[in-house]
Amino acid sequence: MAIIGAGPVGLFTVFQAGMLGMSACVIDALSEVGGQCAVLYPEKPIYDIPAYPVTLARDLVNNLKRQADPFKPTYLLGHTAEQVLEEGEHFVVVTDKKVGVRCRAIVIAAGSGGFGPNRPPLDGITEYEDKSVFYHVSDVSRFRGKRVVIAGGGDSAADWAVSLSEVADSVHVIHRRHSFRCAPNTLRNLESLAERGQIKLLVPYQLAGLAGSDGMLNGVIIRNISSKEETRIDADFLLPFFGISAKLGPIANWGLGVESFYIPIDQSTCRTARTRIYAVGDVAHYQGKLKLILVGFSESALACHDIYKVLFPETPLNFQYSTSKKMPC
């Protein structure tokens, strides 16, 4: 099978396919496996993976790849899946580099599709990017003893404010609203740290400007939403967390009935509108869908079992728990 997307759910799909004796080729536009977890949030703690009270996104990706490795998947990294051609009982997935992957089934595990950060409209911000302005955290030690300004009101902003308060000299959180859109437990931690003076919450404010030279910040200008009064905060780093700009790209033109960047699927099988093309993870949608990694893992299992039944109708699949099967050496 061809798996479109090498994020956590795509990697787990390799494992599920391998456990059923099916081989996989994984196609991803990024140069490394892991998707957003590897590129945007490698040091972000994840708390809702069963049996792991907490794991870093980077470690989750590494473990999923190790779990898939015994099945010897082929990885086409740095390739964008552009076309799907039908040749009898086979598909040929053609990439932007004109490489064709011949397969009998396709599993789309594309997450949010291609992505990039939503950049705040500040003059000269590109001069500071990757030097003192970052849209994701790849190395927590960079911020040790530094003055950090975080902008945003969602999970990423709140999570990193809590985490960086343990290492930074100061953490200011800028949000244009009084309420935050993050997990209740994270919000409680954020408010508790603010009450103890370990984090300073500045609401309702928005970013207004940057101060510094040669790509290195020494201050961030913020503006009060109500009074329009501007204030300068001494800062070494700015972390704007305004979400990502995502698009499905060519997948949207594959005749899958895409709705608002999501692919409708049959919840029980993960089948799409096209025979032998499946979708799992965040890109897949049905009524009541929860966008959680563990839900994507479940969908991978459902899809792979259905694919086996479709491809090998004469070979009954006798369900076995993983402990009853032997892993390849």
From Swiss-Prot:
Keywords: FAD, Flavoprotein, NADP, Oxidoreductase
GO terms of molecular function: ferredoxin-NADP+ reductase activity; flavin adenine dinucleotide binding; NADP binding
Pfam families: Pyr_redox_2 (PF07992)
Record keyword Phosphoprotein present: no
Record-linked SUPFAM superfamilies: FAD/NAD(P)-binding domain
Cofactor: FAD
Residue spans crossing the bilayer: none
Keyword Oxidoreductase listed: yes
Residues at which FAD binds: 28, 36, 41, 81, 115, 282, 323
Reactions it catalyzes: 2 reduced [2Fe-2S]-[ferredoxin] + NADP(+) + H(+) = 2 oxidized [2Fe-2S]-[ferredoxin] + NADPH
Enzyme Commission number: 1.18.1.2
Cofactor: record remark: Binds 1 FAD per subunit.
InterPro entries, A to Z: FAD/NAD-bd_sf, FAD/NAD-binding_dom, Fd--NADP_Rdtase_type_2, Ferredoxin-NADP_redctase_2
Superkingdom per UniProt: Bacteria
Family as reported in the entry's similarity comment: Belongs to the ferredoxin--NADP reductase type 2 family.
Subunit annotation: Homodimer.
Protein name: Ferredoxin--NADP reductase
